Regions:
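A short hydrophobic/aromatic micro-motif that marks alpha-helical segments and, especially, helix-coil
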Residues: 17, 113-114
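Bacterial Sec-dependent N-terminal signal peptides
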Residues: 1-24
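Mid-length scaffold segments of soluble, non-membrane domains
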Residues: 78-113
């Protein structure tokens, strides 16, 4: 029946904004955030020291070859500078490290999404629905994990826990 090729390109993001509307910083192991990357306005009133807006997007292409659906995925993690902010009077290097780890955790879950998507066999009729289901499940896990991180470190105030989390995530990203 020949090779029927079709390509689907979808972008989803943790953030409400798309990567095309705002500048983004792509996650790279060797690059670390600086306070200059946090360009959003501090909301009034806010008792928080800083907020990191990060997340991941995915895209995929699919081909039907001899009746079999072959799907290829790409997942990327982004930091959104205009949606991230800090209060200079409350921030120090420990808080910056805490915010960096939020970005790193997003990368960790982007990798989990990629692994889950790559290990799944899809059918043409259910591809979009199944991908979205997996994405939503991983997003829930990510949000729960980010909340656990903040809770256990007390938003970076518990230095011992912060150091434990730094090591834990660094090891997970190796």
């Amino acid at each position: 029946m020949g090779t029927l090729r079709f390509f689907i390109l979808l972008f989803f993001s943790v953030s409400i904004v798309s990567a095309q509307e705002y500048s983004t910083i792509l996650w790279k192991a060797q690059d670390k955030l600086t306070w200059k990357d946090f360009r959003g306005r501090v909301p009034v009133p806010s008792r928080a020291a800083a907020t990191t807006a990060s997340g991941f997007t995915y895209k995929y292409s699919a081909q039907r070859i001899r009746g079999e659906l072959k799907v290829s995925f790409a997942v990327s993690t982004y930091f959104y500078p205009e949606k991230s902010w800090y209060n200079p009077s409350l921030c120090d290097s420990i808080i910056l490290s805490h915010e960096q780890l939020h970005f790193d955790i997003s990368e960790l879950y982007a990798r989990k999404l990629k692994k889950k998507l790559d290990s799944k066999t899809f059918t043409h009729g259910s591809l979009k629905k199944e991908v979205k289901f997996i994405y939503n499940a991983v997003m829930k896990e990510l949000n729960d994990y980010q909340n656990l991180y903040d809770k256990e470190t007390n938003f970076s105030r518990d230095l011992e826990e912060q150091l434990r989390w730094n090591k834990k995530i660094r090891e997970a990203l190796k």
